[in-house]
Amino acid sequence: MKNEKRKTGIEPKVFFPPLIIVGILCWLTVRDLDAANVVINAVFSYVTNVWGWAFEWYMVVMLFGWFWLVFGPYAKKRLGNEPPEFSTASWIFMMFASCTSAAVLFWGSIEIYYYISTPPFGLEPNSTGAKELGLAYSLFLWGPLPWATYSFLSVAFAYFFFVRKMEVIRPSSTLVPLVGEKHAKGLFGTIVDNFYLVALIFAMGTSLGLATPLVTECMQWLFGIPHTLQLDAIIITCWIILNAICVACGLQKGVRIASDVRSYLSFLMLGWVFIVSGASFIMNYFTDSVGMLLMYLPRMLFYTDPIAKGGFPQGWTVFYWAWWVIYAIQMSIFLARISRGRTVRELCFGMVMGLTASTWILWTVLGSNTLLLIDKNIINIPNLIEQYGVARAIIETWAALPLSTATMWGFFILCFIATVTLVNACSYTLAMSTCREVRDGEEPPLLVRIGWSILVGIIGIVLLALGGLKPIQTAIIAGGCPLFFVNIMVTLSFIKDAKQNWKD
């Protein structure tokens, strides 16, 4: 019993350093919000302007890697000896469910406004050209390219899971073929894991920072409760308590049911917006946007704007590529886990087609609705953002639909469930990554999960206190830098090991 307790306890070398680092950064930020904003702006400017090109080349190189997997020597290799664990339909549905987070609802509803009001390529703000390119840029940033990079890492983790039979809970476990067991399990591996965990903590905190205002703004619209930072903090605290109760009472089945409800409700809400907003316009706009995407794709891939220095690629392309980089390991581990028994080609094609369809549907329906509301002067988004913030503007794009009360109730429930499952996933992932050993069928310790959910909640509150999107963008970009190198090392380790051990 003593030995079992030791194995399932925390791993100090990857538990305390991220806890201390993140705690100190939060304390310094709260101590002087104005000074923190100055530092945030400086970090954002440095990383995006000096290293933005690296993120763009990373995505392009990983895209070539995807083609190598699909048409190369490993295309027909099977990831495990068992038949696929899930049917193809269930598999794609699970991938769709992973896309319908509250943060996705946040960006899907408002992103197009920023592209139209501050467009790329020197276009005039709010011009016809800017509107024609608006959705096309969303399709680029949330389309096949990033999902192709995820599929490469998913193949890598699935290979380590099901072919090499490795128990991977931290990225250092995959680096043995690249740097050797001594370094992978020593100081180097510990540093890699700590980079991963610190970045992941901030990424999850930013997702919570995006999701919470949507729920509190819904509460203001539905119940007349004023939206304040204190209300945001109360809501986050309630989610943490609810998560703790679910874990303590063994209600994980309930959380899984909530995830299914979230997916079905997402389909229902998107279908409603599609029908009442203007199905014909949405399909025409999508078709035109695909053409614009194909026409501008080379420029989008390598757009850094070094001459005009308008800031668009730094604020959006580099930000989103960092977003994809920072979530790559966590998402790839999940996608690998549900892909047992599939071939490399199946996984790569299934991910790119299934997940691209999911994100394109979300962005097309929500973005088109927002554009229609802007064109018809039904809502004044710049005024709403200036007076009340971005979350209120998003809420008004939903409230402007027919049967507004029923629509808002649906959106409120969707955001609430999405954030409950987000907090649960955050605490589970971080607890798994900071424990010595958690075997199949076991849960990480309750107190560890609660502790991480509290810390993620604190980060969300701190980012909300700073105000605006820049702190959230900076947290993602700064966290994406170390993960950029970690992802490359995992990729190289897979390639090296597969060449030696994955032969006919």
UniProtKB/Swiss-Prot annotation:
Catalyzes the exchange of L-carnitine for gamma-butyrobetaine. Homotrimer. The chain crosses the membrane at residues 10-30, 51-71, 92-112, 143-163, 195-215, 231-251, 263-283, 316-336, 347-367, 398-418, 446-466, 475-495. It catalyses: 4-(trimethylamino)butanoate(in) + (R)-carnitine(out) = 4-(trimethylamino)butanoate(out) + (R)-carnitine(in). One of its GO terms (molecular function) is (R)-carnitine:4-(trimethylammonio)butanoate antiporter activity. The gene is caiT. Belongs to the BCCT transporter (TC 2.A.15) family. CaiT subfamily. It comes from the Bacteria. Signal peptide: none annotated. InterPro entries: BCCT_CS, BCCT_transptr, BCCT_transptr_CaiT. One of its GO terms (cellular component) is plasma membrane. It is a multi-pass membrane protein. It is found in: Cell inner membrane. GO terms for biological process: 4-(trimethylammonio)butanoate transport; carnitine metabolic process. HAMAP family: CaiT (MF_01049). Pfam families: BCCT. Keywords: Antiport, Cell inner membrane, Cell membrane, Membrane, Transmembrane, Transmembrane helix, Transport. Pathway: Amine and polyamine metabolism; carnitine metabolism. This is L-carnitine/gamma-butyrobetaine antiporter.
